């Protein structure tokens, strides 16, 4: 049965506060055992119902809101509202609500004319509780101009579907999936949100994302991550099709998660890596188009690295393991350092199969002793045999990747555009002819203490074509050697140049690398690759219901 809000006194004139009239129609539908509350075309202004967890409009079992179409029926927060509103439209906190939703309308948070954090759609039970909302359907809904989240279904929700909907110009994420089970996001678009386009968090599992698009967002296009609390990781998630492009950070970030498949997507033009796997296991990256990323920093198109949460809630070091990257077409921008790169942080068991990689400075760099490449001849890094301390490791006339061991190695790239990583120990590095990259994957690879020097020496750095890759170390740029910067200086004779930090780790080690000759006039961000600005993903606290303390990013 349909309940027309105008029969309950709603005007939809863009001026009057219609909250009470719309809620009366919802209550009538619920009292009758369920139904559809219909809002004809018009702008319906609403105010806060009371506490943040009361929202503006409270849906109940069996009740759906329906309008005349996105942009035709608009529910808009009144000017001057100064209250926190956890869901302009929402379900009740602490109650199990089922068989409800909304379709064919727009929610407008009016963020330019209000204050207080306002979310668009919110539903969920109680974090950590045994109950859940069930059977939720949202179709053809636009959520815009919220100061908080656009769509924010929360823990726990079972069998939720959001399809053919849009979230844009919101202050945080466009779409959140916070502890959803057996749920689907399909054919949705998130753009121009201040943070992520899509944020999948807090133990969400058995979840499918099909043909969604995220572009022009202030952080990542799509994030799948655990978050602040020590909970079960998001898992068994399929991301199929769609596009993630022109976002400020990663196109897709998979962090502290497991059993994820990303396939058939177009990922391009993002500020950082196209895909970043960060402390995740059993990830499959299949048949995607990944291209022209690294727009804001020198980073790989696809980056595999582990995540250190030992100081966090879990006390765990999340090693990235068992990543399968197959059948992708990967091409780089001018800043793309590698097509696919593993960090030297324990990441291992990566399988790279039949990927087409072009237009990057180097195609592949792997450190894991069990990681493999097939379909790309010559892409596997060359590594010295055990006990090669002091023995030379020499490349040939092609583009080589030379990896030192734990001793004082000597690496000579020979001809070609080579990658040299001396590893631990005091190494001597020579790129030879070609545009070479000298990689430092850990601060302890090249350092000094108050009593000893263990820095590597680069013998033939050519500033016009060679590069020093420090992106794994977290330094932000050149400076005075403090605050995450490196000081550039020469010795008294001007025969040796140093890049050095004055900030020691717990063992008293301060990063330092030496270059033969005076390079004070030619080392810059053009040939020294620092950590990408804003590419680390902190675990920020997110707002939940009016009684919850917080969630994750």
Curated annotation (Swiss-Prot):
Q: Where is this region: Disordered?
A: 367-427
Q: Which Pfam families does the record cross-reference, listed alphabetically?
A: Beta_helix, HemolysinCabind, Pect-lyase_RHGA_epim, Peptidase_M10_C
Q: Which UniProt keywords apply?
A: Alginate biosynthesis, Calcium, Isomerase, Repeat, Secreted
Query: What processes in GO biological process is this protein linked to?
Result: alginic acid biosynthetic process
Sample GO molecular function, one term: calcium ion binding
Entry's EC annotation: 5.1.3.37
Hemolysin-type calcium-binding repeat locations:
403-420, 421-438
Biological function: Converts beta-D-mannuronic acid (M) to alpha-L-guluronic acid (G), but introduces almost exclusively MG blocks, producing a polymer with non-gel-forming capacity.
Q: What is this protein called?
A: Mannuronan C5-epimerase AlgE4
Source organism per entry reads Azotobacter vinelandii
The lineage, from the top, is: Bacteria, Pseudomonadati, Pseudomonadota, Gammaproteobacteria, Pseudomonadales
